[in-house]
Design a protein with these regions (language model features):
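Active-site-adjacent pocket-lining segments in enzyme domains
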Residues: 105, 111-112, 116-143, 148-204
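N-terminal beta1-alpha1 cap of cysteine-dependent amidohydrolase-like domains
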Residues: 1-108
Length: 204
């Protein structure tokens, strides 16, 4: 799912590069991406997706040096009181919760596939769920791949719930050509995406 200010797209938007850059409004070499792999770090099958995603981003013309990998599992819990690390007065950004301002320095956040429940758990544990929601409402583009799209849709009580409909990615049945009714599951085949901008939802 990808998101504009109060908006979102889903599943394989990276397979639609022109649409992606139209949304961002920048040339590929100028685009900065925050990549969140957290949903896919517990199985090798999901980890394979990291290489695929990086290849897709690179083939679109996005520079590797403009992609920051941000794994929520490395971030301290939001209520944890630091002990022996208190001597570190300016922790490196990959080891702490990003601020809204830092998050908004990126043009898009790409949230990978894997286990949506793991992603949701880590979002809540770290408090990043609140940060990313505020950044999206301020204009950050959200691109959810598989589990990342489920987290943004209506699949999880504690997800972003940008749309009320749950999303079922990698659907191997009949390709849908129109959206189902409010609250019903949106079954997306690979290569298809749901795009949300403000109150408008569409298939692309």
């Amino acid at each position: 799912i990808s998101v504009l200010p109060e908006a979102a797209t889903c599943s394989h938007i990276l397979m639609m590069p022109q649409k992606f850059f139209d949304i961002i409004g920048k040339c590929p070499e100028d685009v900065k991406v925050l990549y969140i792999p957290t949903a896919g770090i517990e199985t090798d099958g999901a980890r394979e997706g990291f290489a695929v995603c990086f290849q897709e981003l690179s083939s679109m013309g996005i520079r590797y040096e403009n992609i920051l990998v941000y794994n929520l599992e490395l971030i301290l819990s939001k209520d944890y009181q630091r002990t022996y690390s208190t001597c570190v007065t300016d922790p490196y950004m990959l080891t702490r919760l990003l601020t809204i301002e830092e998050l908004q320095s990126f043009d898009a956040v790409v949230v990978s596939g894997g286990d949506a429940a793991v992603l949701c758990r880590e979002m809540i544990r770290t408090g990043f769920d609140r940060t990313i929601e505020k950044a999206i409402n301020n204009g950050l583009v959200y691109v959810g791949i598989s589990a990342g799209s489920m987290y943004a849709a209506g699949n999880l009580d504690d997800g972003l719930n940008i749309i009320n409909n749950p999303i079922i990615p990698h659907w191997n049945g009949t390709k849908i050509i129109e959206l189902p009714d409010f609250g019903e599951a949106i079954k997306i085949v690979d290569g298809q995406a749901v795009y949300v901008e403000d109150d408008c939802i569409s298939l692309i």
